[in-house]
Swiss-Prot record:
Protein source organism: Mus musculus
Protein name: Ankyrin repeat and SOCS box protein 2
Major site of localization recorded for this protein: cytoplasm
Lineage: Eukaryota, Metazoa, Chordata, Craniata, Vertebrata
Annotated keywords: ANK repeat, Cytoplasm, Cytoskeleton, Phosphoprotein, Repeat, Ubl conjugation, Ubl conjugation pathway
Record-linked InterPro entries: Ankyrin_rpt, Ankyrin_rpt-contain_sf, SOCS_box, SOCS_box-like_dom_sf, UIM_dom
Subunit structure: Component of a probable ECS E3 ubiquitin-protein ligase complex which contains CUL5, either RBX1 or RNF7/RBX2, Elongin BC complex (ELOB and ELOC) and ASB2. Interacts with SKP2. Through its interaction with SKP2, likely to bridge the formation of dimeric E3-ubiquitin-protein ligase complexes composed of an ECS complex and an SCF(SKP2) complex. Interacts with JAK2; the interaction targets JAK2 for Notch-mediated proteasomal degradation. Interacts with TCF3/E2A; the interaction is mediated by SKP2 and targets TCF3 for Notch-mediated proteasomal degradation.
Protein family according to the UniProt entry: Belongs to the ankyrin SOCS box (ASB) family.
Function of the protein: Substrate-recognition component of a SCF-like ECS (Elongin-Cullin-SOCS-box protein) E3 ubiquitin-protein ligase complex which mediates the ubiquitination and subsequent proteasomal degradation of target proteins. Mediates Notch-induced ubiquitination and degradation of substrates including TCF3/E2A and JAK2. Required during embryonic heart development for complete heart looping. Required for cardiomyocyte differentiation. Specifically promotes the ubiquitination of SMAD9 and targets it for proteasomal degradation, leading to avoid excessive accumulation of SMAD9.
Localization (cell): Cytoplasm, Cytoskeleton, Stress fiber
Observed phenotype of the null mutant: Embryonic lethality with death occurring in utero around 9.5 dpc. Mice have placental defects, that subsequently result in failure to form a normal cardiac septum, leading to embryo mortality in utero. Embryos display defects in vascular development and hematopoiesis and increased protein levels of Flna in the heart. Conditional knockout in the whole heart and in the first heart field results in pericardial edema and embryonic lethality.
Amino acid sequence: MATEISTRGRQRAIGHEEYSLYSSLSEEELLQMAIEQSLADKTRGPTPAEASASSQTNHQPGHFHPWTRSPSSPENPPARAPLGLFQGVMQKYSSNLFKTSQMAAMDPVLKAIKEGDEEALKIMIQDGKNLAEPNKEGWLPLHEAAYYGQLGCLKVLQQAYPGTIDQRTLQEETALYLATCREHLDCLLSLLQAGAEPDISNKSRETPLYKACERKNAEAVRILVRYNADANHRCNRGWTALHESVSRNDLEVMEILVSGGAKVEAKNVYSITPLFVAAQSGQLEALRFLAKHGADINTQASDSASALYEASKNEHEDVVEFLLSQGADANKANKDGLLPLHVASKKGNYRIVQMLLPVTSRTRVRRSGISPLHLAAERNHDAVLEALLAARFDVNAPLAPERARLYEDRRSSALYFAVVNNNVYATELLLLAGADPNRDVISPLLVAIRHGCLRTMQLLLDHGANIDAYIATHPTAFPATIMFAMKCLSLLKFLMDLGCDGEPCFSCLYGNGPHPPAPRPGRFHDAPVDDKAPSVVQFCEFLSAPEVSRWAGPIIDVLLDYVGNVQLCSRLKEHIDSFEDWAVIKEKAEPPRPLAHLCRLRVRKAIGKYRIKLLDTLPLPGRLIRYLKYENTQ
């Protein structure tokens, strides 16, 4: 027998004559090499080359005593793992590490079976050799004959030892199971004719019929069914042979199984039926077959997901179309309350969404606590968003509280999702459809300011977004829009030009009196850690944060252009006094402010912040309009 030596990059067989490769090495070197190889093999899995070589190498079965067999693989039993260098060297050095023994020859029984030598087997039996004794893995010569497809040898062993026909290996594999796995139909038929039990399963509870379906061997299935194999036997996952054949879209095998008594409504451990498998995997022909044979088109798994839901989730358009044509209910929700339309919108499949829209109940959608608009906006599926808006879905439908809590910012509108994604087109679509920009806990305008997207800001303001938005969970004495824009003076000026209220920035609670210590970094960005109402943050407090304080002078300078006579608190004066070039800002704040400036503020206040954009329509000289719009600061 040749011994296989595993190397890092490849496998090669080394026979008696090839041990000369290591003849120049001392015993200590050989042992060291073997130990290193053994340690390396333990710390790494098989390389792609090794896996490929293993799949292409002819099966080398286990032998009778004293040779051993490696555990078999359920997919192609029994695969024998190649010997590593450590085992090869240790086989060369027997019990005495310093004595070399010759490798044993192949067992004569196995040799006779592999070569199909029936006469040799008969002679051994006549000579009294016991061929019904298993090896350490429970394999009999009968198993070997079935595995190698040696029909003549198989019949000899059947006749000599009829009581071993259903004997199993340690992996619970019978000769019939092995013959089926190897697709030796003549051996399969011979065993069944000799009385082999067709429903004995392996350790995974897979029967020969199941393996025949797995290998799409219709003739093997036909033979097994003819010999009364149980078509409804379940493996350890609860799958039947019909589940397996449906997953492979094997209509011929499905026909044989159903004719042999297979139940089309059989369920696995997750309550999944064959029709559900067909819908899930997109096997349209299998689906048609099962529907024709009476399978429930509205079948649901243990999580309440329907076949239509799974087909929509996996974007099998033809399957969805067929299910709907057969009357599938589009209003069956899964355990999370989601309908097929929800998952189709989430996936962004426009065609499936169009098929589901006419058959989906708006009441069921509202009851789910989430609109398909939310899912389409969250995933930037603009085409689906357009289809849903065209179907007149409620653009202001909020997320249910339990769903909103899944997001840290407690978002609730589809518009918020679009703004968070910085999707200007989707934002415009939703606003044109009537989306309210002031419904969320945190205004979408604040998100747009954080992104610095002027186009989105303008869209939101044009459609009524509150430019003086506040954050309820982080209360401030001044608009949060100013807080978010402080690090970009041009953005701050843009917001002030559009009517943002700067007066609260100078209405300090402490005035000229002493202020509390400057806040720690992150003080204004952390949520409250207890149940007490958070304290209201003053403008001067926020301006004292390290990441903002270096811009204190320019920020105050911009804000002074949009307020009248105000009083700087002691903290703001400290900031201005900290840099001598900012002295002019302190002078600018001293009352009284210029009359023209006060008149400008009065006119803008009379117009109102929501009509500031109409300043150009006033019957006034162009120079005055430019002054009102802060286009001429002189």
